[in-house]
Amino acid sequence: MNNNKIKIIGGGLAGCEAAWQAAERGVAVKLHEMKPERYSPAHHLPGLAELVCSNSLRGESLDNAVGLLKEELKRSGSLFIAAALATRVPAGGALAVDRQLFSDYITEKITNHPLIEVVYGEVAQIPEEGIVIVASGPLTSDRLAASIATHTGNYLYFYDAIAPIVTADSIDFGKAFRASRYGKGDGDDYLNCPMDETTYKAFVAALLGGDKVAAKDFEKVVHFEGCMPIEEMAERGPETLRFGPMKPVGLPDPRTGVEPYAVVQLRQENRDGTLFNLVGFQTKLTYSEQKRIFSLIPGLEHADFVRLGSMHRNTFINAPQLLLPTFQLKNTPRILFAGQITGVEGYVESAGSGFMAGINVARLAKGGALTVPPPTTALGALVHHITSVDTKHFQPMNVNYGLFPELGGKVKKKDKRARLAERALTDLTEWQGMVQD
């Protein structure tokens, strides 16, 4: 009987959520967790679903997409959300938890479920047969990573280099102009924020004086030239950025016909053109400093940053290259991935991916049709993004309203998020009715 069980590698947020969802649908699960036999450098608690960084699950308001995602998971019977609500601590408008009680809650639920068997010990390779979910997290062990690489080839990464992303409707197009360097491509593939000499020097000075995030011992990264933090490039000399990611050559401002002193380029992040990332602006600046300093860029003074930059240890796959929207490997559909290893960023997003993977392995085991939530929902928007964006520039992403399809007709900006949330919950209810197991 054990050979027929769904195998889930990793007892973190995604793995536990996937195990719960599959078991609740009548499918037997074997959940593998390497603790307490072996700990990663970031883990300390012996239980399942350990929160290794902050104890905050971020805001609850539907004005934030992560709040909507939590509401969708709550309405869908998520173990992760049930645990969070049962172990919450005061945190203003955020949902924060007692991390020990949170882990204890999930460990108790998982270990006492009649259809879940927890096996402790490291899994060194993906099983050669049967349905498997890989949810081994950002600190996947070296041996398992080597096994994963046999299925993913060169599309497995060990460090992320995330540049900030802003919403298109928050960019001042009176200052930014569209153009590609030397008119290549379609000629207007990039947004360009021009700087004069005074603005550039003030910007570099701000970068050099900005507060940085201290790296943890297990996150010591050797930076390659093409992946250097923007502030470390600035440390090489005052003109370095002008001859690197901010070089103005081949980008004359159409309003003056003259090349600016320096240029910050923004590249379209999604097909709908609602999001743009700051090209080459991977950074270790703190989030508050990023908002302050990057708002000095002409055209971004009032930018809405939906993702801020970071660089840290993070094992993840190139999801749009490798995964179907069902979280199955395209070339080996019996294998699914879930959690941060898929390129979702954040606790709630990891649990959400585990939720979907768990539903789909249950359907796969029963011979049913697999399912994907509508892209108008927070779950669906996130899934759609990580499995459909440009494979060349893929980096982990958190849920945000910039991922959602636009609303039809004119909507006031102050009402937009409420309307997006209302549409999402309506479409979620309809989808739930269609996929009742």
UniProtKB/Swiss-Prot annotation:
GO terms for biological process: tRNA methylation; tRNA wobble uridine modification. It catalyses: uridine(54) in tRNA + (6R)-5,10-methylene-5,6,7,8-tetrahydrofolate + NADH + H(+) = 5-methyluridine(54) in tRNA + (6S)-5,6,7,8-tetrahydrofolate + NAD(+); uridine(54) in tRNA + (6R)-5,10-methylene-5,6,7,8-tetrahydrofolate + NADPH + H(+) = 5-methyluridine(54) in tRNA + (6S)-5,6,7,8-tetrahydrofolate + NADP(+). The keyword NADP applies. Its EC number is 2.1.1.74. InterPro entries: FAD/NAD-bd_sf (IPR036188), MnmG-rel (IPR002218), MnmG-rel_CS (IPR020595), MnmG_N (IPR040131), TrmFO (IPR004417). It is found in: Cytoplasm. One of its GO terms (cellular component) is cytosol. Pfam families: GIDA (PF01134). FAD binds at G10, G11, G12, L13, A14, G15. Its main location: cytoplasm. The keyword Hydrolase does not apply. GO terms for molecular function: flavin adenine dinucleotide binding; tRNA (uracil(54)-C5)-methyltransferase activity, 5,10-methylenetetrahydrofolate-dependent. Keywords: Cytoplasm, FAD, Flavoprotein, Methyltransferase, NAD, NADP, Transferase, tRNA processing. It is an enzyme of class 2 (transferase). Its cofactor is FAD. NCBIfam families: gid_trmFO, PRK05335.1. HAMAP family: TrmFO. Catalyzes the folate-dependent formation of 5-methyl-uridine at position 54 (M-5-U54) in all tRNAs. Belongs to the MnmG family. TrmFO subfamily. This is Methylenetetrahydrofolate--tRNA-(uracil-5-)-methyltransferase TrmFO. It comes from Geotalea daltonii (strain DSM 22248 / JCM 15807 / FRC-32). The gene is trmFO.
